[in-house]
Swiss-Prot record:
Chain's role: Catalyzes the reversible interconversion of serine and glycine with tetrahydrofolate (THF) serving as the one-carbon carrier. This reaction serves as the major source of one-carbon groups required for the biosynthesis of purines, thymidylate, methionine, and other important biomolecules. Also exhibits THF-independent aldolase activity toward beta-hydroxyamino acids, producing glycine and aldehydes, via a retro-aldol mechanism.
One Pfam family from the record: SHMT
Modified-residue entries (N6-(pyridoxal phosphate)lysine), positions: K230
Record InterPro entries: PyrdxlP-dep_Trfase, PyrdxlP-dep_Trfase_major, PyrdxlP-dep_Trfase_small, Ser_HO-MeTrfase, Ser_HO-MeTrfase-like, Ser_HO-MeTrfase_PLP_BS, SHMT-like_dom
Descriptive protein name: Serine hydroxymethyltransferase
Subunit structure, interactors included: Homodimer.
Cofactor: pyridoxal 5'-phosphate
Organism: Francisella tularensis subsp. mediasiatica (strain FSC147)
GO cellular component: cytosol
Keyword line: Amino-acid biosynthesis, Cytoplasm, One-carbon metabolism, Pyridoxal phosphate, Transferase
Family: Belongs to the SHMT family.
Amino acid sequence: MFSFEKNSLKNTDKEIFDAIELEVKRQHEHVELIASENYASPAVMEAQGSQLTNKYAEGYHGKRYYGGCEFVDIAEKLAIERAQQLFGVDYANVQPHSGSQANAAVYNAVLKPGDTVLGMDLGAGGHLTHGSKVNFSGKIYNSIQYGLDENGDIDYEQVAQLAKEHKPKMIIAGFSAFSGIINWQKFREIADSVDAVLMADIAHVAGLVAAGVYPNPFPYVYVATTTTHKTLRGPRGGLILCNNNPELAKKFQSAIFPGIQGGPLMHVIAAKAVAFKEALEPSFVDYQKQVLKNAKAMEKVLKQRGINIISGGTSNHLLLLDITNTGFSGKEAEAALGRANITVNKNSIPNDPRSPFVTSGLRIGSPAITTRGFKEKECELVANLLADVVFNCGDEKVENETAAKVLDLCDKFPVYK
């Protein structure tokens, strides 16, 4: 028998308890600019930390291989129904443990080993699972990669040319570091010209799509995958969506279970359901609109400060910064900003001469700071502070002065009260 008091984390494992406390302190004291990060609500965290973690539930709701699933079935059914409503589709699989797992399941459902896949190059802003040679997607399948044009937009002419030349079985439209708007219709026209399945990876923009402030990939795509954190502000996990295609939906269902996963994480699925309910509220639309405004506010200041933005600016929540002209690498800038209580991630830029471990760029985004309550005024300040540090990496005085300003700002906008 367990006692919530006697067997608390603090009493049971002080090392882990202390590590969590330090992370809570870091999250309060640092401005979070990593584009793929956000803050989950107390309700989401409560569901994820619930006793649902104890329940094994192989299979799908109503069709389990274990008894005692009648209540976790409620949670999964709610998650599915809310996801369908949120994205306007008739099929949602809420069981993928991550976005990468969701992608892997789609590949397994649609492709055979050795089939050709056309996806965005990692160096141009794509994701590892879009065909990178170091990832399963580039090892199991014949991966062909497209990039950006001279204006920093997706090179649709190249996509069409590569599709015509290589006849891919599937084309992936999606990104992890691209600040533009994807033309889903143009991708569909290219896919149809070679009889390819079109898949959208909307992991970064799912919240924007759900709120109607970024183009919805349906009805142009056959299937969309996403994570459930990032702009969706839920727990870390994955999601598969499709519409008006029961044959494909059946394949995705079996591709997840028993294809690549066993028991689903019912506590995470419950947390997904909570996040989807939150995303269906009118306030979520207001939040996503502010995400876009805040990204544009940072763009304006960074341009004024002489920092180059790949693609010329942003039309979503993220900005990819080329900091070559500062004389410092992405690795150096990330470390310096960390000392100044600003969290970013180093990121390769198109045709980057530096390795992915060093880079010439930084990727920043507005979802987390918007959740925190920042508006344009605060984001302009943050962008100026970022520029102060990036042009003066290693200057202890600049870093310390910036950290003090960041701490003052963070105290005014606590993440959790």
